[in-house]
Amino acid sequence: MFYFASAPKTSDLVALRTRVDELHLKETLTEKEASTLKVLSGLHNVRNKALPYGRGTFDIIQLSEIGQGKAAPFLNFDFNLQLVAFILLFIGFAIKVPVFPFHTWLPDAHVEAPTPISMILAGVLLKMGGYGIIRIAYPICPLGAQYCSFALVLLGVFSIIYGAFAALAQTDFKRMVAYSSVSHMGYVLLGLAVWKLGEDGATVGKDYWLTGVNAAMFQMIAHGVSSAGMFFMVGVIYDRVHHRDLNQYGGLMGLMPLYGGLAVGLFFAGLGLPGLCGFIGEIFSVLAAWNYSKLLAIIAASGVILTAGYILWAIQRVYLGPEYKGPHPEAITPINQREAAIGFILLFFAILLGVYPAFLFNLMQASTTQFVNNLDAVFTTAPEALKAAGGF
């Protein structure tokens, strides 16, 4: 219900304090409603399966136990049910992530939203999709998740490359940052999906997959910091000159040195520069993918080069280069204390997570290890029970 409630409220926030194009607002709301309906359809399917056995529930833990064969042979979600339910759940959550081709609402929503709402969208809302895939889709439908793993890896890699190329093509500063989110969240899906089974049913390179899951979790948090920071820095200059045309910016480092320094630091975090938060999740996702497919890992790694291309190009056009030539040059004034405080806080966390990633990994290690062990056990310690229940 709370997931469903986020759909109209997201649209309300996007429309806050701005004259939103009605078509864009309807698109955002429609995408959110479609996301919710897919999730509800998937959960409804698995609940109906359990209903005749007195287990008609939406309790995530109980549904996960059934899906993982812990209730077999008396009750189990067979392969066909898990496949259909997983696809529905994944599509529903992927719209929120978002990954290609479910991303179309995101650039328009960010462009129309006020700066604080863009920061919330990037830092919190997108993570609801990733959390749902990890917390609900995989544990309840492990057979479907494993069967779709190759398709998910392809989708993650394509999102990385597509999002980067789309960002390169933008002239709107905020839309460029929005497309960068599509690329960065592709690493989340890549790290999560590199689940590879051997002929004996055991996970091949289990430690690599655990690394990928840890990377996916870390990347979601790191992206929440760097992307929120980039949107904030776009908003700071937009509030002064009221445009986002990259071709009309220039020389802001000289006009607003403190703002320029904070902005470059946060954009470097989004770039994935070593020592900043964006580097850890991306490099570990690529390392995990190397065990799954060396070719796909190389393609995913090339996304880092493309990311450097559009981030450095934006820095050169906005903060360096010739003098500012857009409207309202008289409004370009140094940032105030409130803006500086927000920028410093975000940059502090970007540096903290970059130089001391163990701060997060230590918190999540126990949960991610249990997550991987539980799903691996579906294909190792409990295959006979699942077969008896029609799971394979």
Residue ranges, per PLM feature:
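Small-residue-rich segments of transmembrane alpha-helices in multi-pass membrane proteins
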Residues: M1, P116-G129, S181-V194, M256-A263
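Alpha-helical transmembrane segments
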Residues: F79-G92, N214-G229, L295-A308
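Membrane-interface alpha-helices at helix entry/exit sites of multi-pass transporters
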Residues: A113-G123, R244-G261, A297-G303
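Predominantly late transmembrane helices and immediately cytosolic-facing juxtamembrane segments
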Residues: S227-F231, L296-A331
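Internal transmembrane alpha-helices of multipass membrane proteins
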Residues: H110, G123-V124, C148-Y208
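Juxtamembrane/interfacial segments at transmembrane-helix boundaries in multi-pass membrane proteins
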Residues: M1-A94, P98-P101, I133-A151, V194-N214, ...
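Residue-level recognition of transmembrane alpha-helices
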Residues: G123, V177-S181, Q219-M220, A263-L266, ...
